[in-house]
Amino acid sequence: NQNHDQIGNRAAGDRLAATLDDEGLVIAAALTLLGPFTPMLFMGEEFAASTPWQFFTSHPEPELGKATAEGRIAEFAEHGWDESAVPDPQDPTTFTNSKLDWADVSSERGAAILRAYRVLIALRRTDQAFVDHRYEANAVRFSEDHRWLVLTRGLLGPDVTPVHVVVNFADDAAEVPVPDAVGEELYGFGATEVDAGVVRFRGRGVVVLR
């Protein structure tokens, strides 16, 4: 998942929203929010913030500020980044560029991603399958060749029906077998279809079902 450290220490401070499409963002959100670990959300990711989170500083000592900027340029040059692509951490615009643009919330993309986050958070809070975090209560199946994954939660509860988080990472169509599912779709994003024991994808997407 995203956080200030992982994003800020990228050369340009670009978020996942800068490179992933909506399906990719919701897949990442589903695995973060419905996984067995305590999720952490990074400010703005819930509405696909378009602003970066760049590394910025306000050192009062000019020599320290200069050394910080030169150090970052040298660090990323080793990984093939051009100097012009690495913002100066002492430049005030590096800070202002990192502020959230609240207009993103009501944009078409932002609103769609926010709806997805709200549904996923509600599922985590209300469905008993997501309560048990013990190792044995969870299972994962995947196909490396076909690039799909099934995360199953709630395997140990006597009065809990397991929930399956089914993901297709590939751009290609996929049929993912979920033989233990009862077929109740709780959420879906992307071009998907749920049939008896099978989830069909026409591209990347995620389905949550019992």
Predicted regions and their residues:
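Loop/helix patches that line or flank the sugar-binding groove of alpha-linked glycan CAZymes
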Residues: N1-V163, F169-A174
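Short secondary-structure junctions
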Residues: Y135-F142, V182-E185, A191-E193
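Ser/Thr- (and often Asn-) enriched beta-sheet segments in non-cytosolic proteins
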Residues: T152, E175-P177, V198-R200
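C-terminal beta-strand-rich structural cap/linker in extracellular carbohydrate-active enzymes
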Residues: D195-R210
